[in-house]
Amino acid sequence: MFGISFSELLLVGLVALLVLGPERLPGAARTAGLWVGRLKRSFNAIKQEVEREIGADEIRRQLHNEHILSLEQEARKIFTPVQQEPTPVEHVGEQTIHSPAAPTPAAPAVAPTESAPVVAPASVEHVAQTAAPTTPAPNDTTQPPRAP
C-alpha cells in the first residue's frame, strides 16, 4: 500500500520490541491497529463524500442542462409559427365523367320565348336533406383503396 516490504515491517516491529519492551508491546500494537483502522475509515468516508458531491454536482449539471434545453425548445415554439398560413382553395370547375379528349356535343339553343320551370327554394332544400349519401362503386378507380 505504501511501498513497505515485509522486511521493513519486521525491522519496525523489532525496533518497537526493543524500545517498548515485551510488556507494553501488545497494547501498543493494539493501539496502533486502532489508529490505522480509524485512518482507513476516515479516508474511506472522505472518499465517499467527495464521490457523492461529484455525483450530486453531475446531477445538478444534468438538471440544469435539461432545464436550459426545455427553455430553448419553448423559445423555438414561440418564435416559429405554429401553423403556416393556409393556402387559398381554388374553385375547381364542374366535375366531368367523360374523358376530356372526347368532343363535346353542341348544346341546342333555347328559344327566348320558352320559359324554364321555376322550382321553389323550399322544395330544393327538402330534396337535399332527404337524398341518400352516395357511395363510390366498389371498382371505382378515382377513390383511394380502403383497408379491409
Curated annotation (Swiss-Prot):
One Gene Ontology cellular component annotation held by this UniProt entry: TAT protein transport complex
InterPro entries reported in the protein's UniProt record: TatA/B/E, TatB
Subcellular location: Cell inner membrane
Protein's membrane topology: Single-pass membrane protein
One term of GO molecular function: protein transmembrane transporter activity
Region: Disordered, residue numbers: 85-148
Keyword Cell membrane: yes
Gene Ontology biological process terms from the UniProt entry: protein transport by the Tat complex
A Pfam cross-reference name: TatA_B_E
Record's compositionally biased regions (Low complexity): 107-148
Annotated transmembrane regions: 1-21
Primary role: Part of the twin-arginine translocation (Tat) system that transports large folded proteins containing a characteristic twin-arginine motif in their signal peptide across membranes. Together with TatC, TatB is part of a receptor directly interacting with Tat signal peptides. TatB may form an oligomeric binding site that transiently accommodates folded Tat precursor proteins before their translocation.
NCBIfam families from the UniProt entry: tatB
The protein's name in its UniProt record: Sec-independent protein translocase protein TatB
Species of provenance: Pseudomonas fluorescens (strain Pf0-1)
Name of the gene encoding the protein in the UniProt record: tatB
